[in-house]
Amino acid sequence: MQAVETPVLGQVHYRDLREWLALVEGFGELTHVKGADWHLELGAISELNYRRKPTPALLFDEIKGHQPGFRVLTASSSSSRRLGTCLRLSTDLTDAELVEALRGRPLRWEQSAPRYAPRVVSDGPILENVREGAAVDLSLFPVPFWHEHDGGRYIGTGCSIITCDPDTGATNVGAYRCMLIDDRTISVQIIPGKHGRVHYEKWFAKEGRAPLVVALGGDPLLTILSGLEVPTGISELNY
């Protein structure tokens, strides 16, 4: 067995998903797909792509029945280079180098998380397009019907669901499935035992409702963290 040298990690800078897409396209791992149908075709293309080696990220646009610019990204972190970029480690890590780069880091991230509280800001691109009340229309989004026997169209697969504990204010970010019910409603599936489920059960016991945020198209790093088992007491927003 050949030893793997500890990789030299450079600083990777990107502010949002758009800048991340530009980085990935720059090193040749982004494929544009135009004109796919949200009903099964988008999911089938994505499934076949996952079986390819190497596996590029796919950016779907001009999806059937929807305006250009309403896009869907799949396979965002399905290569060492893209995962290393998401984690802001390096843009050119091999599989072995990524494993070496991550050695011991999760524990250090857990230990240092309390020192990195989220910073609340009053402005940002997320506030450029706002729809409230009767103007809410989820049909604008090209929500895929991914697989033949799915129960519906899932808008939340690579997503971040943010909840908080009503007693302590502690936050949690999880990747829970969200299904489109109608133009104004989605359902969120959080199985028992998950931190988000603990939070909303507390809210329902107190007020009969539970506030939460469904974040789509955010920083790819947050999407990855949403799927991790971060220990109780540590928020993914700090981690």
Regions found by a protein language model. Name each.
Residues 1-239:
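Extended, highly charged
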